[in-house]
Amino acid sequence: MSSEESGKSQSGKKKKRRVRYGEEEIESVEIRYFPNPAPNRDYYVQIRLPELTFKDPVSGYPDFAVATMVYIPDARIVDLKTLKLYFNSFRDKYFSHERITNELFDELLKGLEPKGALLMMEFNPRGNVSTRVVTTTDDAFLEQARNVLELPVTRPAF
């Protein structure tokens, strides 16, 4: 490991770690939105982010998830690069599965203001338990998204 990677200079004194350009982008990211190129047509957008990482709030161990978002744009669509950077900003933050799902969904709804949306988070097994958390703007959109995109999601019957 180089002295730069270890955070120590050759004299053994603690050295200030250099912030890399990707880290700067992630730290300062704001999700951008663009005008919908076809505002008079309803169409579905499916976005899959397979590498979401964050930390468990109890143990501090890393957690991993695949995020799948489906939405019908209204006036805006999301910029994928800034969305990716925004998702990367969660890497060193602490969340429960339910909290991160709802926080991400709320942020996207605020910026997109879509006609309908769904966010499905599939978390890697932890302690031999798999978790899937789904949130949606309404039950009708859940059914639309399921039928159109063949999502393996149904509303549980309680």
Question: Model-flagged regions — what are they?
Answer:
Residues 2-158:
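N-terminal intrinsically disordered, cationic/polar leader segments
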